Amino acid sequence: MFDRVLLTGISGFLGGHIGLALLNAGYTVRGSVRNLSKADKVRATLSAAGADVSRLEFVVLDLLDDTGWGSSVVDCRYLIHSASPFVLRAPADEMALIRPAVAGTRRAIMAAVAAHIERVVLTSSIAAIQYGHAGDEQVLSEADWTSPSSPNTSHYARSKTLAEQEAWALMTAAGRRGDLAVINPGVILGPLLDNGLGTSALLEMAGEPTPAPLVHAHRYVFD
């Protein structure tokens, strides 16, 4: 029997690449989508990329709704939580980003703890580390946090910071801190798996090209 992984956000850019890597590594993947209308496209995309989609399942989950979270982890050994809101333009109300990011992380962690999931991986961001510090030439580590109250902290950075802090708090309270792994990448670049329009393509079409800066914390998606 293949180990089963619950992967939230499989229809996203990063989630799709994670799903492909898991399937190619022999795992059974239970991917979450907001509605099942996306399932056929995800299945076709991963199949075209060479994955064995006979081990691909789908479950409907909403970051702001409790429905389905408990059953989504049944028979799963691992959970990878990559679903989190990301928008082209920062909303006027920061809670439009913060609420689903934090609430979705809370639901994922609580479901994992209740089901005794062996290992939880959270996709956070360098944005949860780098903002609100005095001076520009500091060496930052996992011990450092972005300051949510700093005027230099964007809505997105605040949402990622608070969501990651929620994950650590819940796993610590459950006595499971050592079973949580968090990655904090910078901008993730790489090829699209399908012909959908990612954020960069939409900005380009809008006449706002976004060339990569000379110095930044980029990561290639295959890393």
Please place each PLM-identified region on the residue numbering.
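N-terminal Rossmann NAD(P)H-binding glycine-rich loop of SDR-like oxidoreductase domains
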Residues: 2-27, 32
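NAD(P)H-binding glycine-rich loop region in Rossmannoid oxidoreductase-like domains
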Residues: 36-38, 47-103
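Conserved Rossmann-fold NAD(P)-dependent oxidoreductase catalytic core, especially the SDR/UDP-sugar
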Residues: 81, 85, 90-156
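A conserved pocket-lining segment of Rossmann-fold NAD(P)-dependent short-chain dehydrogenase/reductase
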Residues: 90, 147-152, 195-222
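Flexible, glycine-rich beta-alpha linker
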Residues: 129-130, 178-199
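Active-site Tyr-X1-5-Lys
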Residues: 150-180
